[in-house]
Amino acid sequence: MDHGFYPTNLEGEGLRIGIVQARFNEPVCEALREACVAELEQLGVAGEDVLLVTVPGALEVPLALQKMAESGQFDALIALGAVIRGETYHFELVSNESGAGITRVCLDFNIAIANGILTTDTDAQAHARTREKGRDCARTAIEMANLTAALDGLQDHGQDDENE
């Protein structure tokens, strides 16, 4: 059986990327951002095509993402932050609600969002994951921006032409 295949496309040239970074657990979040921005540049995204905004914490990230999505100015968005377990239920609340909010914005506004909000048990775990997670978010945002653009062009794929 023959089938179509869309290969992974990590070409970032010409893409506009919005980044929302939480400031809570700032050293971790800054390391995430540095790795993410470096990878975006490595993959061809121009500095002037990246907009970074910061918010107090992970729970504020979805609203900023929503405002960016509403603008229609971005091909993909990236959420960066760190939620580190403490001694209360707050960890679960922040982790679950920020993740659900990010997913809702993604689906409501039909825009790719790379979720780089780390959820770890310790500071050491968070620091150990910053570099790879930051780079992964850049790659995910670019890949999904290119994929969604390609899929937008598939409106009639697989449908028989009624005029034949």
Swiss-Prot record:
It catalyses: (2S)-2-hydroxy-3-oxobutyl phosphate + 5-amino-6-(D-ribitylamino)uracil = 6,7-dimethyl-8-(1-D-ribityl)lumazine + phosphate + 2 H2O + H(+). Gene3D superfamilies: Lumazine/riboflavin synthase. The active site is at H90 (proton donor). GO terms for biological process: riboflavin biosynthetic process. The keyword Transferase applies. 5-amino-6-(D-ribitylamino)uracil binds at F24, A58, L59, E60, A82, V83, I84, N115. Keywords: Riboflavin biosynthesis, Transferase. Belongs to the DMRL synthase family. This is 6,7-dimethyl-8-ribityllumazine synthase. It comes from Ralstonia nicotianae (strain ATCC BAA-1114 / GMI1000). The gene is ribH.
